[in-house]
Structures are given as structure tokens and as C-alpha cells.
Amino acid sequence: TTVVGLLLVYNFSTPLFAEDSLHYLSLHAHMGIIGWFLLLIIGVGSRLIPMFLISKYTNASLLWWVYILINLGLIAFAFMFLYMLPVYFYLLPVAAVTTALLLFGYYCRQAYRQRLRKQVDEQLKISVLSVLMMALPVILLIIMIISLWVAGENIRLVLAYGFTVFFGWITAIILGMTFKTLPFIIWNKVYHKKAGLGKTPNPKNLFSNRIFTGMAVLYLTGFVLFVTGILLSVVFILQIAALLLLLAAVLYNFNVMKIILHKPAIL
């Protein structure tokens, strides 16, 4: 992804490709989204979600199939893009990636069903929700391909697709996993020498759960409204949604700083 991006930058001044750099922007974006973000999140999620659920479920062969299907889909997309095949051919790589996501969803579902921890906290719920939210850009992409094939490009669908990728499952798993991992990291840094000398705070007490809940509500409401505003082209809805997402970001940063600036306390 980095090499392609660098080549596209040089292509602005020195012709390296047959077309201008903007023509290859879609290829570069999907190499980053699928080849980097998606594989990274699935890799991290496949380890952290079962771990925090305290689940005994494991299935390495299924995860290998997820990995293979995603990479096959990405390679097929790059081939079709470079050779400018008809738009309906793009349904094949979409089908491969969709199958991979369904398999990963099955993996997470089995991990959830075989969990030892029966009560699931809000942070993990958001992380699990991010897995379900992966379906939204896939659905929009299928609609977008069919629309492009039948009636031409639909800018609103393109914008909604991009938004649901970056502000959907990517943002959701970051919001959830931040408050599952960061408190443990800071707790270990602050209290690793004090453990056993007295009662120390629980890692989950290093941040405000009420603020996290408020952040989650603002984020999900803002996300739904923003997608609605894009599809309906209603500026007022977009403005309200942007405000809600901004407030969610403020609460997120407040809680993160609360964790980072935590001072030692023996109870």
C-alpha cells in the first residue's frame, strides 16, 4: 500500500502509469482498507475477543480460510481493476471477502457462545458490534456495483460506503478495545510493584463507565444519523450527526486522558 501510494505521488509529475493518479485512487484505497485495516482488525479481534470473553473456542483452520479468502478477493479486485473488466465481475471479489467476513462472524459467535464469562461489559459489546457492522459497507458495495452496472455512479452510495468503513467497524472496535487494553497497560505500569502490598484499584475503575456509555450512545446515534443524512442528502441531519460524533470524540479523549494521567492509589 505504501509503495503504491508513493508511486502515485510521483505519477503526478512523472508519468509512471497509463492513467493519472486519481484513476488508481480506488485501487490504492482498497489495498489499504482490505489489505491493511481489515486484516489487522480481524487478526487482533480473533485474539482479543475470545480472550476477554474467556472463551475456550479456537479454530485456526477457519481463520486461515478467512485470511486466504480476503487476500484472494483483494488480488482479484486488483487484477480486474488493472485490466478494466466489466463492473459485474467485481461481485466475485466481493463474494470472496463477504464469505471471509461471514466465517469470521461465525468464529466470534462461537467464541461468544462458549464463553466462561457470562456477563459481557459495554466495552466488549461495542467490539462485538463492530464485527456485525462489517456487513454495512459490504451491503452498500454490492448495491453500488449493481447501481453502477444499471444506472451509473451514485455519489451518495460512494460517500456512505466510505463513511461506514472508517466510522463504522474500524471506529467501533477502536472505541471498544481501547478501554479493554489501555487500562490494563496503565494499571500494570503504575501498580506492578505495589501488587500484593495492599488493595489496588481494578483496571476497569481507571476510567468512567458512565462516560463510556454516553460516548457509545452518542457515537451509534451519530453514525446512524450521518449515514441517513448522506443517503437522503439532508444537510441538517448531517450537522446534527457531526455534532454527536464530535461529542463522542470529546468523551473518548476525556476517558483516555483519565486513564493515562491516573495516579497511584492504595485502597
Regions found by a protein language model. Give the residues of each.
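Hydrophobic alpha-helical transmembrane segments of multi-pass integral membrane proteins
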Residues: T1-L267
